Amino acid sequence: MQNLTSTFVSPSMIPITSPRLRLPPPRSVVPMTTVCMEQSYKQKVVVIMGATGSGKSCLSIDLATRFSGEIVNSDKIQFYDGLKVTTNQMSILERCGVPHHLLGELPPDDSELTTSEFRSLASRSISEITARGNLPIIAGGSNSFIHALLVDRFDPKTYPFSSETSISSGLRYECCFLWVDVSVSVLFEYLSKRVDQMMESGMFEELAGFYDPRYSGSAIRAHGIHKTIGIPEFDRYFSLYPPERKQKMSEWDQARKGAYDEAVQEIKENTWRLAKKQIERIMKLKSSGWDIQRLDATPSFGRSSREIWDNTVLDESIKVVKRFLVKDKV
């Protein structure tokens, strides 16, 4: 079977690569309520959760290389190709040869993937990974998609994280939940520095290429990738200073520098808000009966030593996954 991880998605290749072509007809994709069929056993999956920037991707690679794992992306912004710096996608080198699924597979101008579509696509990936004798590892920060994938009874018309909604603890997979948690003050400081590093690593140039004058209308934002943090925040900047008007930053006047700084600060603030929402949603899942193991990664932040991460996060994760995999074995 072709490894989708290595498939480069471009508009000219959509008929070949778009994962939506692997979906069943729409009537079977979005039922009123989807219920898991009775099985004699449940497939085992590891689910890595956490706020943006907490280290989910790092832990997923660490575990996949130790337990013959394959990673299924559950970050809805990273489903799309393009804007790899802005969406903070792991490079091929950083993936350490671990197969990834639903990562950069949709063309950037594709419509937003629904939770029902993700449930179908990710379920298929899990079945294929299990059939190869490997361990499916779900990793990403979109908790509404994780919920849609895992719950036994799924109603696409109900938003699970509204205050009026109760979340079921009935799951259609046997799950090992790992929550990589970092204290809010430490995480926010790290996220601010990460935004600065992303801007220095080509995010601004990437966004300038994205803001082609042909896409200056607001309708294009209905597409999935256009909701990425970094794009709407730079709307005002690029409306005032179109990307074709190239000029070195050292030559900018104060007004242009101010518009740029304002956009970067807005990115930081919206990233903080996203992190808070993600933590709140994980806590709701945990309080609803999901057996989520919290891992405190705070000591490893701000430190350059790999040993601290291994001692505080990785070693405990390995123990938890080992117990999970041997459970129920004779």
From Swiss-Prot:
Pfam families given in the database record: IPPT
Q: One GO biological process from the UniProt record?
A: cytokinin biosynthetic process
Give the EC number.
Answer: 2.5.1.112
EC class:
transferase
What molecular function terms (GO) are annotated for this protein?
A: AMP dimethylallyltransferase activity; ATP binding; ATP/ADP dimethylallyltransferase activity
Query: Disruption effect?
Result: No visible phenotype, due the redundancy with other IPTs.
Residue positions annotated to bind ATP are: 50-57
The places in or outside the cell where this protein is found are: Plastid, Chloroplast
Catalytic reaction annotation: dimethylallyl diphosphate + ADP = N(6)-(dimethylallyl)adenosine 5'-diphosphate + diphosphate; dimethylallyl diphosphate + ATP = N(6)-(dimethylallyl)adenosine 5'-triphosphate + diphosphate
Which segment is the transit peptide?
1-35
> What does the record say about tissue specificity?
Expressed in roots and in immature seeds with highest expression in the chalazal endosperm.
Alphabetized UniProt keyword annotations:
ATP-binding, Chloroplast, Cytokinin biosynthesis, Nucleotide-binding, Plastid, Transferase, Transit peptide
Q: May I have one GO cellular component term?
A: chloroplast
Function statement: Involved in cytokinin biosynthesis. Catalyzes the transfer of an isopentenyl group from dimethylallyl diphosphate (DMAPP) to ATP and ADP.
Q: Which family does the similarity line name?
A: Belongs to the IPP transferase family.
- PANTHER family (UniProt xref): ADENYLATE ISOPENTENYLTRANSFERASE 4-RELATED, TRNA DIMETHYLALLYLTRANSFERASE
Name used for this protein in its record: Adenylate isopentenyltransferase 8, chloroplastic
Which species does this protein come from?
Answer: Arabidopsis thaliana
Phylogenetic lineage: Eukaryota, Viridiplantae, Streptophyta, Embryophyta, Tracheophyta
